[in-house]
């Protein structure tokens, strides 16, 4: 490894490579470095347990799941520095890779499986157990890893510089800056402190509102009530940093998708269906569209257009990626026949688990999943189990590339949207073959849990592999030990979920679990003969097709339609800062240096925000309530303070890139 003073990512780390140009990672492919050992595996398991428990609690109690990768990277760097371990970069990547299973498995599990407990209040005959939750999460996670590995080279190497990989960028900068030490890590450390303190003040103390909205003035309230027009921006440091790393291009199209939904579709629906109660696919809706708030119209109707857009963008992505899928399967078939290249001829940094093992592992996992469905979920009905495994395996495999693509573009996996589509499709198919009622709901939710975890883990894992590619770790080692992290995280989340149900009860309203509540609301009518919002899904699908025809990134646009407005606008603000700091000088070298400095600052904001998310969760878990948000945030002045703080944060960001 290079000396600490010279330790930095190559100049071509974040841009497309020229013809004949090669990317050379920090750790030379021709040398061997400490990666997998007792230290890294033990710390990885500890991180997986701690962050799985914290993420599960936070996600179920207050409806927010934080990304654990950056926080784990910071802790790994801190521990290795405190113990003065030399050449710890490879070890830290393994710690991060094992530990990061936590957020991915948690997201996959809590988006679907708590819906079983929620529906139990209405259908007492629906039962579940720790083993069912663990099996659904673990099998889904293992499938996600196995299905992603064949696409590693395409996403991290072949497409180098074409995708921003925001979370991977931030985590990599944390690991590199930690390995550097001294003044070279200073910008990231300062930005981490500023971003962390800023987000802690908002999340834990509530000194100013987390969002600035047009409702801050009476005219804005009137526009929201009558015209259903609203503007919202999340003023957090972490989301601003995310926007900077994504860049202006993808941030623009994501925000544009959001504005089309919030400023055209939502007001348009209010005008067209003002006095109508549109409850054909959701009997719980009793309000007319005109009586709803913009947020209610978005949740009840407009977001479904985004789901349709994501699904169609995913299908288009599968079609476009068909050559890659075909070559990956072909390579596996070739190796199974014993015609593969000798593993020793492949560079260490390009060495994956053999396709023979992946193919056999995939078949064995699918077989175990089939047996789990047959005896554990379908009560011995062979037909239902066969149809279930065919649906789960096909959807999980095909949408793996979509999940990885979304993470590579915006750092946000639309897993809840894809899972909702899976649930709807699975429910329609299972009803058609005769599986209805509570038994059908349980089966569809377990199937959804497997798919959701598979896609969540696949999306998260591509981040780990990109980090390894930039730094020069061995993919084969990351891949092998990822399975351990998945099993540990699945066991932890299963235990936490059952504990929270016993303590609070999912049906009591004490646990937010918004995604699981949405799944329960969708699946209940479907399994009882009520239709899905196919028209809205169809509109979203048509929009995605039109966008693709005009060469506009359909997935980024559809993500914008699905993700709330307040989380998309700051992406545009961050992207605009990126454009500004990298273009305001006539000297290209100065622009490049400022851009790199900005990436460090943005990474610090993301890292600080993520770490404070964990601290806030621990405070809430311990019953420590110091926030004044409940009483203060109803006052419009809290939003004025929010805007002023945001302007100061942006000013700090831009000024810091000049130093």
Each model region followed by its residue ranges:
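Alpha-helical multipass membrane-protein architecture
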Residues: 1-659
